[in-house]
Swiss-Prot record:
GO terms for molecular function: monoacylglycerol lipase activity; nutrient reservoir activity; phospholipase activity. This is Patatin-15. Belongs to the patatin family. Its main location: other. It comes from Solanum tuberosum (Potato). A motif (GXSXG) lies at residues 75-79.
Amino acid sequence: MATTKSFLILFFMILATTSSTCAKLEEMVTVLSIDGGGIKGIIPAIILEFLEGQLQEVDNNKDARLADYFDVIGGTSTGGLLTAMITTPNENNRPFAAAKDIVPFYFEHGPHIFNYSGSIFGPRYDGKYLLQVLQEKLGETRVHQALTEVAISSFDIKTNKPVIFTKSNLAKSPELDAKMYDICYSTAAAPIYFPPHHFVTHTSNGATYEFNLVDGGVATVGDPALLSLSVATRLAQEDPAFSSIKSLDYKQMLLLSLGTGTNSEFDKTYTAEEAAKWGPLRWMLAIQQMTNAASSYMTDYYISTVFQARHSQNNYLRVQENALTGTTTEMDDASEANMELLVQVGETLLKKPVSKDSPETYEEALKRFAKLLSDRKKLRANKASY
């Protein structure tokens, strides 16, 4: 039902898009979206490190950071953590983490985050170390201080509604100006794995506002690309920097969407005969895997359809590994051996073709994206200087 509704929304977006005007490069809206997936966040971290390295090379600037080039960076679960790491400012008002720092972060802290709590009835992990390290790294920083627009999702189990943390929402909903560590823990608090997170903020009149949040994947089913595009669309309508964008047009969007890998095409498939013998617990685990795999595929399908309909397929790049096997399929296997395998998955993915119909590799496509991002940044800087 939810996927049908999403498709209809996008279908009417296409119908509403009548302008054939191509945006000037400096006025294109650039969007980065990062999926959820626990320790598998190592895979998009490898991709981000490569892209940031390319931007530094193209611009001959070792201090170039991803937040300098993207108008919107969105993520859910581990993707929300990556979003915070590359957009939260340090004391010099620069991202506190470079992309190359993310994989070492997983290696240092992953084994402690995914350390079995020993509880039979509660979540698999108590979440204490995760919250502690997020507090240490992100400090008291709040959403409004992010270096670019962010879109981090969570789900409130008390109101039964998604909660989207963005800078652009704060004027209307100041209670969303939460601390980044609270947001990061909340978006990563996957049911079964971590406890839900409770915290409070304040409304414009000073009243206490309560949150009871779980994993953002409950709201976006693991892939926040549609959410990130929605935030980018609103940004384009409200920000004077994008004055040439008169109506929704995906020719005017540049979207990079990073997955954390799936195994839907190669592993953990089932027959009707097998599934007929399952009990509730086995079905619960299988449904989670199936839902994540189906959602990732359908979101990519929807977005690809929209960009192709606007003859803008080169403006969208989905980087995803669909052949995970063995321990690399697990979101919580933080053993050193498995993390090394995930690094290899990311590095190998860069050499793979983007599609069966194109010889272009992900590495080549990311270099093309880096050049576009660099050119747009320079054009925008020149325009601002007049």
